Design a protein with these regions (language model features):
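NTP/phosphate- and nucleic-acid-binding module
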Residues: 1-467
Length: 467
């Protein structure tokens, strides 16, 4: 059974994300910019914690996976070799009534018809024509469209084109990060001590000229990928693939704390010609189950293509057997933004407090929370309380992500920290200073999830908060 979600959950998450500084529409003072978003002060911390968790799980927890940070701009032939120049496209149609441009596969999906991503332009148009009376424009509601045309998603740039002479052809902002890994395969092999099987991990920005911008940060034109390409002997690819499937599913439950019932597997029935297997881990977003991470057995296609187009030998010579071969690749690929949205969705909770009040709380795992501890003086107009609170704050910030807050009454401060997802709030009051001799040197610690409060000695605070 999946967790029941209110119909307006997406709207509530978007509102909270802006109100509490997680996500802002980009360039909002100019009216915004479709499918482009900025992380605010708490969003950037949550995103960093997600990156760090992924990097630890993929790189630091393995002795045969190394990191890479490849450039966003690459030689134009990289994208020819990868197939992006000729085949990286979505089917586009224009509404003849309001001139809105929309993805045909999304229009069909809205009426329960699913178009295979490998369909030719002719095939997608035949399917589109078959269901044209049911398909409605999302903007004006009419059913009057042009034929579908394939629209390339690569974002073209004028980089280096000072004279208008495109000697190398147009340059692009990268459409995916993995190509930077493939073209550096030989460099990593030659400069480090890795041997097959080994992996290369990378986190970085990618860009796609998406036709339809929707579903908040789930589908963006500028987004961040976290990918690992694992190079193996062809005979070990199938076994390795299953091992990584298990590891990656467990990661979301055990490391990120997502509820297992909100995750499921989806197998690709129709594979691209070079792929041997492709499964997605799907998460139950407010708009339904959608892809969170893809795990793919890509065979030797990528290294073979780049070897051919670059005229560079990208084969591997096994030092033990002297066998020479092109390694196969097992890929794990996830979007940071989608992970961010999944973590935010899973954490979002509304709870009744008393008979009439409702509190909103983000129940992040402690290690992901943007702020781990908030420190309050009971009153901001009492210098002795503020001074002691600052002292506690400065001590705790050596080991925790800490925020100091003295605005408003303590109850309102609690609610604000609940909406930020802060696991603990520490309040310095007059008992801390010795008004009650039996409580001198103690503080009140309030737990986010239970709302229970406990007195803890200042010298024991660090140990208590780490428990």
């Amino acid at each position: 059974m999946t967790t029941e979600r209110p119909a307006d959950l997406m709207e509530k998450i978007i509102s909270l994300a802006k109100r509490r500084g997680f996500v802002y529409p980009s360039s909002e003072i100019y009216g915004g910019f479709a499918a482009v978003y900025d992380f605010g002060p708490y969003g950037v911390e949550l995103a960093k914690n997600i990156r760090d968790a992924w990097w630890k799980a993929m790189v630091y927890d393995h002795d045969n996976i190394v990191g890479l940070d490849s450039a966003i701009f690459m030689h134009p032939k990289v994208w020819e070799a990868s197939g992006h120049v000729g085949g990286f496209s979505d089917p586009l149609a224009e509404c003849k009534e309001c001139h809105a441009r929309v993805r045909v596969d999304h229009l069909l999906e809205a009426v329960g018809v699913f178009a295979d991503e490998k369909m030719s332009e002719t095939e997608i148009n035949a399917l589109f024509s078959e269901h044209k009376d049911k398909v409605k424009c999302p903007k004006c509601g009419k059913s009057n469209f042009t034929e579908a045309k394939n629209f390339n998603l690569l974002v073209q740039s004028n980089l280096g084109n000072f004279t208008g002479d495109w000697t190398l052809g147009p340059t692009y902002l990268r459409g995916e990060t993995c190509q930077g890994i493939y073209v550096n395969f030989k460099n990593v092999l030659d400069s480090s001590r890795v041997k097959v099987p080994f992996g290369i991990a990378q986190i970085g920005k990618a860009f796609r000229n998406e036709i339809t911008a929707r579903q908040f940060i789930f589908r963006k034109r500028e987004f961040e990928q976290m990918e690992m390409q694992y190079f193996v002997h062809p005979s070990e690819a199938a076994t390795t693939y299953e091992e990584w499937r298990e590891k990656r599913f467990n990661y979301y439950v055990e490391t990120l704390g997502l509820r297992k019932e909100n995750l499921r597997w989806h197998e690709h029935e129709n594979l691209v010609f070079y792929a041997k297997a492709a499964w997605d881990i799907e998460y139950n977003f407010p708009f339904g189950f959608k892809e969170l991470e893809g795990i793919h057995n890509r065979s030797d296609y990528d290294l073979t293509q780049h070897s051919k187009f670059s005229d560079t030998d990208l084969s591997y010579l096994d030092p033990k057997t002297n066998e020479k071969y092109i390694p196969w690749i097992v890929e794990t690929s996830v979007g940071l933004d989608r992970t961010f949205l999944a973590v935010l969705t899973d954490a979002y909770t509304e709870e009744k407090v008393g008979e009439e009040d409702t509190r909103i709380v983000l129940k992040f795992p402690k290690k992901l929370a943007p702020v781990q501890v908030a420190v309050f003086p009971l009153l901001k107009n009492k210098p002795e309380l503020v001074e002691k609170a600052r002292e506690v704050y400065n001590t705790l910030r050596q080991d925790f992500r800490v925020e100091f807050d003295d605005n408003g009454n303590v109850g309102k401060r609690y609610r604000r920290q609940d909406e930020i997802g802060t696991p603990y709030c520490v309040t310095i009051d007059f008992d801390t200073l010795g008004e009650n001799p039996g409580l001198e040197g103690t503080v009140t610690v309030r737990d986010r999830d239970s709302m229970q409060q406990e007195r803890v000695k200042i010298e024991e605070l660090g140990t208590y908060l780490k428990a």
